[in-house]
C-alpha cells in the first residue's frame, strides 16, 4: 500500500514537471466520444464500451484533480441521445448509479464536488436519486468541480434560457436594453462556472455536437484521435501541453 502511494505521488510529480503550473486550464470540457466504436472494434456489445468509458472518467477525474484543474465538464448524455436503442439508453441511464456507488467515496476523499447541467428532471428516478445523493454528499467539497452534462444540449439550453429571460423581462417590466453578454451568461445552466479554456473531443471526430455552443466561443479545441475508453492520463497531459503551446487571442492579434 505504501509503495502504491509513493508511485502515485511520483506520477503526479512527473505530470507537474511536464506542465507549466501557471497555465493549467481552469476549466476543461470533454466530449467523450468513441465508446461504441471501441466496443465494435473488439466485437463486443456497445454497452461494454460505455462501461469502459466509465473507467476512463475515473482516471481523468483523478489526474485533473491532482494537477489543479478547477472545473471538469463531461458530455455524458445529450438531448439527442434518446434516439438510440432503448436497451442502450437504459444501460447508460444506469451508469451514474453504478459509477457514483463505486466512485463516490474517492470523490469525497479527494474533495471533488459533483454537479450537473442539463434537464435532469427528465431522467429515470433511480438516476436522479443517485445524482442528488452525490451532490448532497459532496456539497461542501471545495476542490475540483466534476460537472456532468446529462440530458443536455446547447440549443435546448439557449431556448430554455431565452424563455426565462423573456419571462423575467415581462414580469419586471424591463425592456431588451438590459440584455448583454453578462445578462445572458447569468441565465445559462453554466452561470456558476467560467467558460472552458480547453475543449477536448476524443475519437478523431471534429465537431462540437451541440455542446456548450455559447460557452466555447473562445475555447481552444483539441481533437484527440483516441477512442474515449483508450484516452488516459498521459493523453490528457498531452492535450494540456498542446493548449499551453498556444496563444489565446480572443479575436485580437498575437504578440510579435
Swiss-Prot record:
EC code(s) of this entry: 2.5.1.-
Top-level taxon of the source organism: Bacteria
UniProt cofactor(s): Mg(2+)
Cofactor binding remark: Binds 2 magnesium ions per subunit.
Annotated signal sequence range: none
Entry-linked Gene3D superfamilies: Decaprenyl diphosphate synthase-like (3.40.1180.10)
Residues that, per the record, bind Mg(2+): 33, 220
GO cellular component: cytosol
Active site per database record: 33, 81
Keywords assigned by UniProt, alphabetized: Magnesium, Metal-binding, Transferase
Annotated GO MF terms: ditrans,polycis-undecaprenyl-diphosphate synthase [(2E,6E)-farnesyl-diphosphate specific] activity; magnesium ion binding; manganese ion binding
UniProt xrefs under PROSITE patterns: UPP_SYNTHASE
Membrane-spanning intervals of the chain: none
Name of the top EC class for this enzyme: transferase
Binding positions (substrate): 34-38, 46, 50, 78-80, 82, 84, 201, 207-209
GO biological process, one term: polyprenol biosynthetic process
Entries under InterPro entries matching the protein: UPP_synth-like, UPP_synth-like_CS, UPP_synth-like_sf
The keyword ATP-binding appears for this protein: no
Oligomeric form and interacting partners: Homodimer.
PANTHER family: DEHYDRODOLICHYL DIPHOSPHATE SYNTHASE 2 (PTHR10291:SF0), DEHYDRODOLICHYL DIPHOSPHATE SYNTHASE FAMILY MEMBER (PTHR10291)
Sequence similarity: Belongs to the UPP synthase family.
Physiological role: Catalyzes the condensation of isopentenyl diphosphate (IPP) with allylic pyrophosphates generating different type of terpenoids.
Protein name: Isoprenyl transferase
Protein source organism: Staphylococcus aureus (strain COL)
Amino acid at each position: 500500500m505504501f509503495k502504491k502511494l509513493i508511485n502515485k505521488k511520483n506520477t503526479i510529480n512527473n505530470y507537474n514537471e511536464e506542465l507549466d503550473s501557471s497555465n493549467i486550464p481552469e476549466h476543461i470540457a470533454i466530449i467523450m466520444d468513441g465508446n461504441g466504436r471501441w466496443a465494435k472494434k473488439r466485437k463486443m456489445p456497445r454497452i461494454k464500451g460505455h462501461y469502459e468509458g466509465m473507467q476512463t472518467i475515473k482516471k481523468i477525474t483523478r489526474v485533473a484533480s491532482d494537477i489543479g484543474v478547477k472545473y471538469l465538464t463531461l458530455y455524458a448524455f445529450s438531448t439527442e441521445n434518446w434516439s438510440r436503442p432503448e436497451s442502450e439508453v437504459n444501460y447508460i441511464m444506469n451508469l451514474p448509479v453504478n459509477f457514483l456507488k463505486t466512485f463516490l467515496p474517492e470523490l469525497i476523499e479527494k474533495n471533488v464536488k459533483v454537479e450537473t447541467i442539463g434537464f435532469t428532471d427528465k431522467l429515470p428516478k433511480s438516476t436522479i436519486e443517485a445524482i442528488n445523493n452525490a451532490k448532497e454528499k459532496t456539497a461542501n467539497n471545495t476542490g475540483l468541480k466534476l460537472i456532468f452534462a446529462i440530458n443536455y444540449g446547447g440549443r435546448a439550453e439557449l431556448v430554455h434560457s431565452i424563455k426565462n429571460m423573456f419571462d423575467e423581462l415581462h414580469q419586471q417590466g424591463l425592456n431588451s436594453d438590459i440584455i448583454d453578454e453578462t445578462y445572458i451568461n447569468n441565465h445559462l445552466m453554466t452561470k456558476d462556472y467560467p467558460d472552458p479554456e480547453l475543449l477536448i473531443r476524443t475519437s478523431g471526430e471534429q465537431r462540437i455536437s451541440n455542446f456548450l455552443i455559447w460557452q466555447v466561443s473562445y475555447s481552444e479545441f483539441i481533437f484527440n484521435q483516441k477512442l474515449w475508453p483508450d484516452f488516459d492520463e498521459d493523453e490528457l497531459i498531452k492535450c494540456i501541453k498542446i493548449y499551453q503551446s498556444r496563444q489565446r487571442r480572443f479575436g485580437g492579434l498575437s504578440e510579435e
